[in-house]
Amino acid sequence: MTHNTMLQRFNGLLEPTHLYIVSVVAYSACNRPDKISGIAKEAMEHVGPSIYPKLREALVKSSPLVGFPRTINSLREMTTNIPPPFPDEFARAADADIDTGKRGKIYFEKTYGKVTQRVLRSMQSSSLDLANIALDYAYGKVLSFNEVVSPLETSLMIIAALVPQDVNPQLRGHLKGALNHGATKEQVMSARNIALEISKECGIQFKGDIETL
């Protein structure tokens, strides 16, 4: 597959950087790490080497959503087949001096807006440990870190990670949450539709209709 094929396939739905972020994460969520290096190569040819850290960070950020094993396999596939154009540095090193718990809480509240407390109470009623891990780790240390991938790009990445898993309750919140982080309705629906098509290509069977705006 060439970058022209990818761009023709999803012609005009998203700008190239966002398209490639959504694509690698959707394939990773579908457990198709074999697709990752080809897309990363296309992205570097079309956008330039600067997209490589974004693709790597998008996959890192997807880890609490799709699971560490799939993320590890996808990143290994990418880095093994495409030598990183820049040294791999610990991007979150500066977080040692930041209250990531507070940062995660702010990010969580911006994502869910007026339904923040309802979402939090729902998680807490299921498991206090789960709620704290979600806020402190997933949101605090991972999703709210914006030095490489922006909040808007993170929101599109989350949609791409959730669609293949057929988890409408979570997808519903993040479709709306993406709007709160600056995405347009068209961008949100494009990320959803691209991830949905990739899921079908990978043989994912859905129980019913996938959530929409």
From Swiss-Prot:
Purpose of the protein: Probably involved in peroxisome formation or maintenance as well as in amino acid metabolism.
Q: Which organism is the protein's source?
A: Schizosaccharomyces pombe (strain 972 / ATCC 24843) (Fission yeast)
Q: Which family is this protein grouped under? A: Belongs to the PXP2 family.
State the UniProt keywords alphabetically: Cytoplasm, Nucleus, Peroxisome
Q: Name the source's superkingdom.
A: Eukaryota
An example Gene Ontology biological process: cellular oxidant detoxification
Q: What is this protein called?
A: Peroxisomal protein 2
* One matching Pfam family: CMD
